[in-house]
Amino acid sequence: IFKNGTIIDPKSSYIGKKRLPLLLLDTEMVKTDRTMFSARGAGIIGFSTFGRNTKYALDKDMQIDFGLVEEFCEKHRNETVLMFGYTYMIWQYVIRALEEKGKTFPFSKVIVFHIGGWKKLKDQAVSTLEYNKRLSQVFGGGVEVHNYYGMAEQLGSVFVECEYGHM
């Protein structure tokens, strides 16, 4: 309960107390296939408590389920939408995949929380500024991005990056 309380307090100042429509930028397999269950799965399950009408953007083959995301986008077009995923996976399987297809999802307001995977992106020379810019381009202009640290290394102790880029 304490760890769950630790997760709730920092995020409520960013997303409010109301549960938002949640699009998980991952595959549901991470939750249903126990061989894939890890800190990643625990993070997804923990973060899911902040959402409602939760959907997974990626199919079992880590491809964007365009029909599902388009339907989610249409259903929640005039609402603030919450998204969560792992930094590298969002880059690889969402941002780059959408760019390659020349596709965007025009949400009116999106709050994205992402965690982990910066070491993998370092090899690709992706800065925080570039990451946030391209994330905003594929999900529309009203994107608020929050990078945070702590789920893998210290499950339950969460540190959200401030507006100046400090944790």
Give the ranges of each region predicted by the language model:
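Conserved structural elements of the adenylate-forming
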Residues: 1-14
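Active-site glycine/GP-rich loop and adjacent strand/helix microenvironment
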Residues: 16-25, 33-167
